[in-house]
Amino acid sequence: MLSTVHKAGRAPALLRHGRRVPVQASQLRALTSGAQNTSIFQTQANAAQRLSSQKRWLSASAAAAAASQPAPDAKAYIQSGVVKPRDHVDVKKVLVIGSGGLAIGQAGEFDYSGSQALKALKEAGVASVLINPNIATIQTNHSLADEVYYLPVTPEYVEYVIQREKPDGIFLSFGGQTALNLGVQMQKLGLFEKYGVKVLGTSVRTLELSEDRDLFAKALEEINIPIAKSFAVNTVDEALDAANKIGYPIIVRAAYALGGLGSGFANNEEELRNMAARSLTLSPQILVEKSLKGWKEVEYEVVRDANNNCITVCNMENFDPLGIHTGDSIVVAPSQTLSDEEYHMLRSAAIKIVRHLGVVGECNVQYALQPDGLDYRVIEVNARLSRSSALASKATGYPLAYTAAKIGLGHSLPELPNAVTKTTTANFEPSLDYIVTKIPRWDLSKFQHVKRDIGSAMKSVGEVMAIGRTFEESFQKAIRQVDPRFVGFQGDKFEDLDFELQNPTDRRWLAVGQAMLHENYSVDRVHELSKIDKWFLYKLQNIVDCQKEMQQLGSLEALKKEHILKAKKLGFSDKQIAMAVNSTEDLVRAARKGFGIRPWVKKIDTLAAEFPADTNYLYTTYNASSHDVTFEDKGTVILGSGVYRIGSSVEFDWCAVSATQALRAMGEKTVMINYNPETYSTDFDTADKLYFEELSYERVMDIYELESASGVVVSVGGQLPQNIALRLQETGKARVLGTDPRDIDRAEDRQKFSEILDSIGVDQPAWKELTSVEEAEKFAEEVGYPVLVRPSYVLSGAAMTVIRSKEDLKDKLEAAANVSPEHPVVITKFIEGAQEIDVDGVASEGNLILHAVSEHVEQAGVHSGDATLVLPPANLDQTTMDRVKEIAQKVAKAWRITGPFNMQIIKAEDPEGGLPALKVIECNLRASRSFPFVSKVLGVNFIDAATKALVGKNVPEPTDLMAVKRDYLATKVPQFSWTRLAGADPFLGVEMASTGEMACFGKDLVDAYWASLQSAMNFRVPEPGEGLLFGGDLSKSWLTTIVDYLSPLGYKLYAADNEVKQFLESSAKTKIDVEVIAFPTNDKRALREVFAKNNIRGVFNLAQARGKTVFDVDYVMRRNAVDFGVPLFMEPQTAMLFAQCMAEKLPRPEGIPSEVRRWSEFIGGKPL
């Protein structure tokens, strides 16, 4: 046996990430670590010795023997018979559990991992059945899953599907925490045993071990792996006792919780009392443990098969010290500040843990590491695919989810070829010759009263991943990817900079930038305040020094070639350089190209270029001297959606992937540009070439020019690609496919948009361009309040506000004008009580080809992304449908649309009984977030048709899909993440707040909505006999209608004051009793007791406006419903529809409900 030699000290920066050497061996055998004396992993035969400077794993003689071996060929190696394939799991049909709607803590990474699992099943010839109500995902296309059920991921509905489909296997590891919790519940109910369903991959017992904090602690104790001192408790008093034994500060963690939900730090008894009470409403058990704030946080991704082969695929290090959830941390892969000894100590421990727990598949191990010693603690183990797995997979090029699925089917690592490289087996640890940086994206500014601090509970809605050859290059790229308004490492004004550095918020890196760039803080001072490792801070100091050097030179003419090259190697963008020398981006670009400075294209091959590998997974860098690829394809560039944020999510990834697939089907070569590690579009086999790169004008033009591309698609990735479309065409002379960017501009600019609508005779609400406060006030008086204030070029209603008084108008004008100073602000008459209609369409050269008309359940005033959509519409008559189609045709012609487009129209009843007014309020000349929904409900892929129109090939004939009578309908409902956003007011308005969506089908509106709403995460239908709390606006009859539906079912009815009680009792159809309960708005603990004592399981709060303060009764009622995990209805139409559903659906009938049908059964085939 060979033993590992640990070297003290630190390796050079780019080499310090523990690359392993594949050892040549005649048969498989285990290696033993000298430090831990545990077997580490089995290696593959015939692998070549790494010929790099790292020889720490082999003696000189072994190195010489291995050097003579040829580069490995996976297939030949497997076929040689060295590896005896084990008996594969005998399953014919496998149920795959999806993760449901996107929420904070559980996002698009599960579309990517679930899709990989389905791909593995298809390759193995095993039938797949998917349950996932998230209609916007790629995995819910029939091209991946054989059968799809759009249903809630609950034991009840999954049992119905098992009864119908009779699967013999189930995958629980690819649907995040939702699938894991479901598996544990079903095991406890004995359902797997009852129906003879095998859990594939990691067993439920192991999942329970990793999730139940008490069992987990005991398991690690058995193998002498240190964890933080902790106690698992079930009550608040037990938590206080545990804290007294451990000593403050402590951290609270909830079991079976997603993304740190229900966790946080407590420095004293009062903080702990509140936190423990809140956490115990979200989870039956919490862990109270000693806080290790300030230690380093390090993660390892480990893969193990049932033969006990085990490899570490990637290790990652958090830029931020422990104390910030890894989902809210800046993360670097591979680790940069660990010594060789630290690296291997943690690696050995990870493998020991994974083997001991019996993980079969993929696992994530998180550590706290003492900054100045070899002491460590295990923080957490995720025995499933996670957000970190998606990041590790994209960072290394190792197909983790796909490999985990194959292992679940009984394959061993040595017998699996690596699907990316095609030259190595899956039993080969990746090595990286680049650095990856992940930065989260928050959207906290969209929420009123929200707390901006970041800690152990995750708040970010998305993340970016940047690749560079130096940390500086990678880091600056990532910053620009988070938000195009950022130019790179920069600062911002803070009231108390030292406080900001000590107490992390979502603006943490901006505080570091301000300190170093503008306030001359030293590295030592920033480290002292922030506890960020000095290695990272010295790298940031390099950026600061370079920027200051350019500022001193003062002009573009003074910059020599070496200055520009140095800046580019440190990740500076052309715009950033221009700002430093008072020039323009275009002039810097011209000067750079004049010096012959262009980016080099490199491959991610998982092998650090040591063996030949055939990958199409690319990035650009200035820290190189040659290209890894050739550029003969002249393909079509598709711009992806970028970072997930509120307003732009997995729906646009579905659109980008659908466009790519359509182009490839037509024989076109495709080039995808995107930087979001959570997406299917950034998977290795989606496009012919994948550039993991920024979606900036600079980078897109670099790639377009290098590739000599035939055109660029800007209409399938949401708003981000649209924003650079005109520049790509006018300045870059790129060929933009589809609608002319000048026409896009005529739709985005409110003034031009309105003038064109007037010219074609399409109605719109009265509006005026704003130039001064006085003019605005005058116009508002003329048309009458309420009015809508909005800037041009918005996504998801950013800075749009409904104004109801002159005072409000003055307050809001400044905020709106600040959003987009180049574009004027427009004021529009807001029509209350109107119905909103969504139109998704595809046109070719101004002619309408396809259109879909969805109606909103909510009245106008709720953002379309937060609205409940119904398709086909349940309440629109034929005359209205015909008029809507006519408007769509006129708009397509006026803007000469080629490709996808979306319109929002409001329908306002005529008080004199004439035809209702149809007024266009918005038009986007791109795909919208409802394209996947309408495509899947109508059974026609709108993006496929739009892509054919873009390239002018096989353009379909115009078809009126809305003329077809259907015996089903579907409802799309929003997924909110209020629980994660402490303090935020759960109130719907013109600014979008939802993070995801679900959709279900049914024979009618009640069927579909009933299933859709139960698909929301942790939603529980209040049962008859439980308590319901009412409050809000009493000027309308909404609350009465709800009470009339629900009171016969036997619910107990409560109100927070006498006024609501009297209103309900006097207006209800039958005699009812409403009890007034004490409602202390400033005492959360007392409120919790009120909710518990009265068994309140549902809250209906229909307020007309947001609470002005945090003591407003309606705000407190809404916020606490969310905090206590109680279903909240805060919008009148959906609340009344849900009450109708409860009246019709409760008590639940025997047998399988009518909504439990395959997608293909509803739509009559498998077209997508």
UniProtKB/Swiss-Prot annotation:
It is found in: Mitochondrion matrix. Mg(2+) 2 binds at residues 380, 382. Mg(2+) 1 binds at residues 366, 380. Residues 86-483 are annotated as: Carboxyphosphate synthetic domain. ATP 1 binds at residues 213, 253, 259-260, 290, 292, 297, 323-325, 366, 380. Mg(2+) 4 binds at residues 922, 924. GO terms for biological process: L-arginine biosynthetic process; pyrimidine nucleotide biosynthetic process. Gene3D superfamilies: 3.40.50.20, ATP-grasp fold, A domain, ATP-grasp fold, B domain, Carbamoyl-phosphate synthetase, large subunit oligomerisation domain, Methylglyoxal synthase-like domain. It is an enzyme of class 6 (ligase). InterPro entries: ATP-grasp, ATP_grasp_subdomain_1, CarbamoylP_synth_lsu, CarbamoylP_synth_lsu_oligo, CarbamoylP_synth_lsu_oligo_sf, CbamoylP_synth_lsu-like_ATP-bd, CbamoylP_synth_lsu_CPSase_dom, MGS-like_dom. Mn(2+) 4 binds at residues 922, 924. Residues 484-628 are annotated as: Oligomerization domain. Mn(2+) 2 binds at residues 380, 382. The large subunit is composed of 2 ATP-grasp domains that are involved in binding the 2 ATP molecules needed for carbamoyl phosphate synthesis. The N-terminal ATP-grasp domain (referred to as the carboxyphosphate synthetic component) catalyzes the ATP-dependent phosphorylation of hydrogencarbonate to carboxyphosphate and the subsequent nucleophilic attack by ammonia to form a carbamate intermediate. The C-terminal MGS-like domain is required for catalytic function. NCBIfam families: CPSaseII_lrg, PRK05294.1, PRK12815.1. This is Carbamoyl phosphate synthase arginine-specific large chain, mitochondrial. The gene is arg-3.
